[in-house]
Amino acid sequence: MATSLARISKRSITSAVSSNLIRRYFAAEAVAVATTETPKPKSQVTPSPDRVKWDYRGQRQIIPLGQWLPKVAVDAYVAPNVVLAGQVTVWDGSSVWNGAVLRGDLNKITVGFCSNVQERCVVHAAWSSPTGLPAQTLIDRYVTVGAYSLLRSCTIEPECIIGQHSILMEGSLVETRSILEAGSVLPPGRRIPSGELWGGNPARFIRTLTNEETLEIPKLAVAINHLSGDYFSEFLPYSTIYLEVEKFKKSLGIAI
């Protein structure tokens, strides 16, 4: 009997000691896991240091329509997010700024020498004009078209300023050395005579421009042309795809 009790007590002591050791072991492991910082997964792809960082938004700058392809002079500045579609011609020294849309799907659109179409402008043309005047949109030389303006089948003669947020409707005509104030609406067939300042909705005659004011009009266009040169210098004429070609040739062991 005494021997049996001794064996039972020995087993119970052994099991108790073993369970205490197990608890201590797992507790120590849990503390070690909790205090050990989980290693961050290593990046699987390491970008090449010479790789061009593309900013692709899926927007096309030049959109041919049928047989019509937009034409841009070599020294004209057209911002990357501008859309030129169809019968559009951008002449030398001119500039078309960010977000503008020139839609020549129905008729011709021309931006003349040293003229500028500023941010978010929309320029388009109708099949025909109810006034009997040409339905194409013509922006002649040394013309400044302010931001957020809308031009449709209108004619702007040389050395004019169109204020921002203005609307020029079908058949409207702005004669040379004239100014249309910001936020104005020029109704269909309305004509602004040479050397006058107009404004309002609908646009009305305000006063005659002084000789000094008319001389400042082309200077503004030239100043914007010089500003566009700073932007133009940041873009290569044929993009940066040549870097990818050189890298591909190098990977194939082809002499560059």
Curated annotation (Swiss-Prot):
Q: What domain of life does the UniProt record list for this protein's source?
A: Eukaryota
Name any one GO molecular function: metal ion binding
Protein's UniProt keywords contain Cell membrane: no
Annotated residues that bind substrate are located at: 103-105, 118-119, 152, 164, 231
Q: Where is the transit peptide?
A: 1-33
Q: Choose any GO biological process term that the UniProt entry carries and state it.
A: vegetative to reproductive phase transition of meristem
Listed A to Z, the keywords are: Membrane, Metal-binding, Mitochondrion, Transit peptide, Zinc
Q: What does this protein do?
A: Involved in complex I assembly in mitochondria and respiration.
Q: Which PANTHER family match?
A: DYNACTIN SUBUNIT P25, GAMMA CARBONIC ANHYDRASE-LIKE 1, MITOCHONDRIAL-RELATED
* UniProt name for this protein: Gamma carbonic anhydrase-like 2, mitochondrial
Q: Which organism is it from?
A: Arabidopsis thaliana
